[in-house]
A protein has these predicted regions:
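Long, compositionally biased stretches enriched for glycine and/or charged residues
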Residues: 37-300
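Internal, well-ordered domain-core segments that constitute the primary functional module
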Residues: 1-66
Length: 300
């Protein structure tokens, strides 16, 4: 929903100054840092040492450049992906990947690199969401084969309940708030906006030309420069030809869905729904599913 939220803000209030933050690229930087440690026998490589150029949409970003201490990591990554065809990282005790909601063996992102030549920069469970449905999400067995986890609705409900309970304890004073580093860039972004230094990090903004081959105004994710009272997108270049069809389809669907919601146009919403790469059923079945979802969420 990140892209849709940012797009809606600018659609309703064009003068707004808003941006969307996401840590998926950070996770890919950490993954590449672990690769650097293995390949170059380094210790404790920080993700900030991995310099990247992300292009795409939220949760479906691609790196067209990645380096460590001025060394191009693409050739290194190509060899790394071949070496770790069975996955990378520690294997969990429970090998049922359907129950390992936030763990993966990075197989999806490495498969996408071998096929398209660019680094997919998000967690495997998110990357799978934006690819054609039969690739990685055909059924639970397919998920197990690709060794990533699915987040269940039951877990989300329990997690929300626990977080609301924690909030209540903090408000009442029953629990003391503890300051710690979350690994996010939010504080650094605010400091930069206040004029306390500059920062370059990846965020979601309307396309002003930072990705020339996606529509102007579409919300895209690239690096941006934060400085006193300003956030300026960094020119990232075109989406590569190999991944352009995948990303352009998602971007178009997101724009359709925003327009459908704001104009209350169910026909346009259905067109966006059937355009989604995960919708692989017959049109008649898609219509039944769509109508059922609309009816069951009507109260909201």
């Amino acid at each position: 929903p990140m892209t849709l939220c940012v797009r809606t803000l600018y659609r309703v209030f064009p003068e707004i100054r808003a941006f969307g933050c996401c840590h998926e690229v950070f996770g890919t930087q950490r993954f590449l840092a672990r690769m650097v440690e293995e390949v170059f026998q380094q210790e404790s490589v920080d993700r900030h040492e991995i310099k990247v150029n992300p292009v795409g949409v939220n949760h479906f970003t691609w790196l067209t450049q990645a380096s460590w201490r001025n060394q191009d990591l693409f050739p290194v990554y190509a060899e790394f992906c071949e070496k770790h065809r069975d996955g990378y990282g520690e294997k969990p005790v429970d090998d049922n990947w359907v129950n390992r909601m936030f763990q993966c063996r990075e197989q999806v992102k490495m498969d996408l690199f071998r096929r398209f030549g660019y680094m997919a920069a998000a967690g495997d469970r998110h990357l799978a969401e934006f690819c054609p449905g039969k690739w990685y999400l055909a059924d639970p067995e397919c998920v197990r084969e690709w060794k990533f986890g699915l987040t269940t609705v039951d877990w989300r409900k329990k997690d929300l309940k626990q977080r609301l309970e924690k909030s209540a304890r903090l408000v009442s004073g029953e629990e003391k708030f503890r300051m710690n580093d979350t690994g996010e860039d939010g504080v650094k972004q605010i400091r930069a906006l206040l004029g306390l230094g500059n920062l370059v990090t990846n965020v979601n903004l309307p396309n002003r030309g930072q990705i020339p081959n996606l529509p102007l105004g579409a919300v895209v994710e690239t690096n941006a420069r934060f400085a006193a009272n300003t956030v300026t997108p960094v020119f990232a270049g075109n989406l590569p030809e190999t991944v352009y069809p995948l990303v352009a389809r998602i971007s178009g669907e997101q724009q359709m869905l925003t327009e459908a919601a704001l104009t209350r146009n169910l026909d346009l919403a259905f067109a966006a729904f059937t355009n989604d790469p995960l919708v692989t059923v017959l049109l008649s079945d898609a219509r039944k599913l769509f109508d059922e979802m609309i009816e069951n969420t009507r109260a909201y």
